[in-house]
C-alpha cells in the first residue's frame, strides 16, 4: 500500500485530537459540574433563588459582565443548613484554573486534591481553601453585589 497525502492529513488530525483530549483531561475539564450562568441586574446585584438548595448540595455559577470579566463561584448548604459561598478558586492553586469539586460534606481542590469541610468555607483561611465571597440572604434569595464578585476576578484572568 502506498502512502497517500490523505493518510498524512488523517494522521495529523488524529494526533491533534489526542493532544486536545489529553490537555482537557489534565486540566480537569471532564467530570466538572455544569455552571449556571448569572449576571448582575440593573441594581448591581447578582440574585440567586435558594429554593431547592438542600443540605449537602452545591451549585456552581459562572458570572460574566459586559466587560467580559469572568468569575466562577459556588453556593452550597452544609449539613446544618447554613449557606456557604466562595469563589471556585483558592489563593494557592488559582493559576491552573481548575477549581473545586463537591464530594458529600467536602469541597476538594481539583489541582492538589486537598479537602475542606463545606461547613467551614465562609470562615476563610487562605492557602488552598476556597476564597469566601461576601453575600447576604434576603427572603429566599442570595444577593451578591457585582463589586464583590469582581473583587475575585484577579483569580480568573
Predicted regions and their residues:
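C-terminal extensions
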Residues: 58-60, 119-126
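Hydrophobic membrane-insertion alpha-helices, especially the h-region
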Residues: 4-24
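Solvent-exposed loop/turn segments at secondary-structure junctions
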Residues: 107, 115-117, 142, 150
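Iron-sulfur (Fe-S) cluster-binding segments and ferredoxin-like electron-carrier domains
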Residues: 96-103, 114-122
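Short cysteine/histidine-rich metal-coordination sites, predominantly Zn2+-binding motifs
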Residues: 104-113, 123-135
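Surface loops and adjacent helix of pleckstrin homology
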Residues: 88, 112, 119-121, 147
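N-terminal pre-ligand scaffold of iron-sulfur
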Residues: 24-101, 132-157
